[in-house]
Amino acid sequence: MAPPTILRRMSFRSNGRYGARFDRMPETIEDYYSRVMATADDEGRLAIPADGIPCWEVFPFEAEGLRLRPIEPLADVDEPRHGEAATQCICVGWRQADEPNSIDDEVWRDDHWRISVAEPSGVPLILMLAPLAHHDFTTLPKERAAEMGQIMVALGAAIEALPSVVRVHVSKWGDGGAHAHIFFFARPIRMPQLRGTMLAVWDDFLPRIPVDVRDANARAVTQDLVRTYGGRAVGRAA
């Protein structure tokens, strides 16, 4: 017989979204917000833990004098994201382009996916993977989801093969656009201060990488991806 915790999970899934037999209902946002605000001061500010992130050696800022902004009131609704309607999504232009090479930031594509390169930033390379068809991350068909996993592994290995890179950081947020998109940050080698979750913050302050250096990195990565996974290099990487 399955353990009780497994049975509770099974009843949760088998009785609709929140089954009657689930031993505790999921917390509402009102309850969550009230619990957060109960720990805030009179200005709505949360305290910074003495052993929190500002104590990490990878934190980009001096901790002295640092304070959090006040927690804002609950919004009535979340603002709609760009591309909620498929006909207004940026992916329409991707599919209608006569040649992928005409899309300036695109460096790789196959029948279902594309990879674009970000504007020059502080790290050696930032790439973005997205499906050509209009899907959010949680609505990808099984076939596309399986492809995504394979591309992510191959792309990560290609990025980590760059001589200036030790690791690839993978990020998915999705608050700005409704179309699925995943970011790949190249973390510089032998710079341990840039490791971990603060890399995206450091990226804003590091000097911009020259365009020709960025393009050379993108070209090496996409050619490696073509060799190990497939697809074709386009645009700056062709």
Each model region followed by its residue ranges:
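Active-site microenvironments that recognize anionic phosphate/pyrophosphate groups
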Residues: 6-124, 228-238
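Glycine- and small hydrophobic-enriched segments that form the cores of compact globular domains
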Residues: 101-115, 137, 141, 147-151, ...
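Short histidine-centered catalytic/ligand-binding loop motif
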Residues: 127-151, 202-210
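Active-site helix/loop of acyl-thioester processing domains in fatty-acid/polyketide metabolism
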Residues: 146-162
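A short glycine-rich, hydrophobically flanked beta-strand micro-motif that places a catalytic Asp/Glu
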Residues: 163-176
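A short beta-strand motif that forms the metal-chelation/ATP-contact edge
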Residues: 180-186
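C-terminal helix-cap and adjacent tail motif
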Residues: 188-238
